From Swiss-Prot:
Catalyzes the alpha,beta-elimination reaction of D-cysteine and of several D-cysteine derivatives. It could be a defense mechanism against D-cysteine. The keyword Heme does not apply. GO terms for molecular function: D-cysteine desulfhydrase activity. The keyword Signal does not apply. NCBIfam families: ACC_deam_rel, PRK03910.1-1, PRK03910.1-3, PRK03910.1-5. Its cofactor is pyridoxal 5'-phosphate. This is D-cysteine desulfhydrase. It comes from the Bacteria. The gene is dcyD. The modification N6-(pyridoxal phosphate)lysine is found at K51. Its EC number is 4.4.1.15. It comes from Salmonella paratyphi B (strain ATCC BAA-1250 / SPB7). It is an enzyme of class 4 (lyase). PANTHER family: 1-AMINOCYCLOPROPANE-1-CARBOXYLATE DEAMINASE-RELATED (PTHR43780:SF2).
Length: 328
């Protein structure tokens, strides 16, 4: 894989070292299959999470452009917004967050606790909207208003999921390949598929580094018909910027996100409780709980290509647990 193409993109060091790749012995015994976990939940800033991988590239670009304000959007309990705000605070930048309430709840925990509480600690400027129906356009409108106030804004898309941001997960694929080289021959990788950047970056990287590994994206907000074009568009954009081909099919499972984005379901909450009780690992009700429910059910239903070792990408999100009480 031509690494020189990846290294030509400016990158701000935020993580510092590879995140752990760990064997989960008790979960493996429970499921009857070797299960490993990539611990992107333990990145070092503001209670961790995978978005730091994307922000390393996006914020480097913002600094290159001379920005003094980061603008992004998401749900009230967005992990991405929390991590963006934390990085802004760390670097002395202003952060403006455009937030929606996607589940329409009036529950105080959801509206004020978890990630939302942390945004206040980071001195984030909060702008509420009824719904993020066209987030790119809404962010641009907000950026124009902020610029008129004398700031130099840089727009970071929902989830950090642009081709540039997704370079963080091409790099993650390199990390995974190196960590697995002398430890385990992976058969499959499972990841939550939402704003699509994490999934697409892994798809490009793993196709060139571990082409025999089956990559499964478990959707957290959309059907396969809605999600697949989003992942493919980013996959092709990433590959184009890296001068690579991207021909791997995109595999998605959409059986585990109902009733909708941000709304807990029984299978997801059972997965959260299972990982906590067996391994002391905290998942969340929005992303990783539902993705782990997919992994567990996928093994039960024999949906994988074979029964070899599987790697679960833990993208973080535990701060949201406090917002979803009493579901937890």
């Amino acid at each position: 894989m031509p690494l020189h193409h990846l290294t030509r993109f400016p990158r701000l060091e935020l993580i510092g070292a590879p995140t752990p790749l760990e064997y989960l012995p008790r979960l493996s015994d429970y499921l009857g299959r070797e299960i490993y976990i990539k611990r992107d939940d333990v990145t070092p800033i503001a209670m961790g999470g995978n978005k730091l991988r994307k922000l390393e590239f996006l914020v480097a670009d913002a600094l290159r452009e001379g920005a003094d304000t980061l603008i992004t959007a998401g749900a009230i309990q967005s992990n991405h917004v929390r991590q963006t705000a934390a990085v802004a605070a760390k670097l002395g930048l202003h952060c403006v967050a455009l937030l929606e309430n996607p589940i329409g709840t009036t529950a105080e925990n959801y509206l004020t606790n978890g990630n939302r509480l942390l945004l206040d600690l980071f001195n984030t400027q909060i702008e509420m909207c009824d719904a993020l129906t066209d987030p790119d356009a809404q962010l641009q409108t907000l950026a124009t208003r902020i610029e008129a106030q004398g700031f130099r804004p840089y727009v970071i898309p929902v989830g950090g999921s642009s081709a540039l941001g997704a370079m963080g997960y091409v790099e993650s694929a390199l990390e995974i390949a190196q960590q697995c080289e002398e430890v385990v021959g992976l058969s499959s990788v499972v990841v939550a598929s939402g704003s699509a950047g994490t999934h697409a970056g892994l798809a490009v990287g793993l196709e060139h580094l571990m082409p025999d590994v089956e990559l499964i994206g478990v959707t957290v907000s959309r059907s396969v018909a809605e999600q697949k074009p989003k992942v493919i568009a980013l996959q092709q954009a990433i590959a184009g910027q890296l001068a690579l081909t991207a021909t791997a099919d995109i595999h998605l499972w959409d059986d585990y996100f109902a009733p909708g984005y941000g709304v807990p379901n029984d299978a997801g909450m059972e997965a959260v409780k299972l990982l906590a009780s067996l391994e002391g690992v905290l998942l969340d009700p929005v992303y990783t709980g539902k993705a782990m429910a997919g992994l567990i059910d996928g093994i039960s239903q024999k949906r994988f290509n074979d029964d070899g070792p599987s790697l679960f990408i833990h993208t973080g999100g535990a701060p949201a647990l406090f917002a979803y009480h009493p579901h937890v």
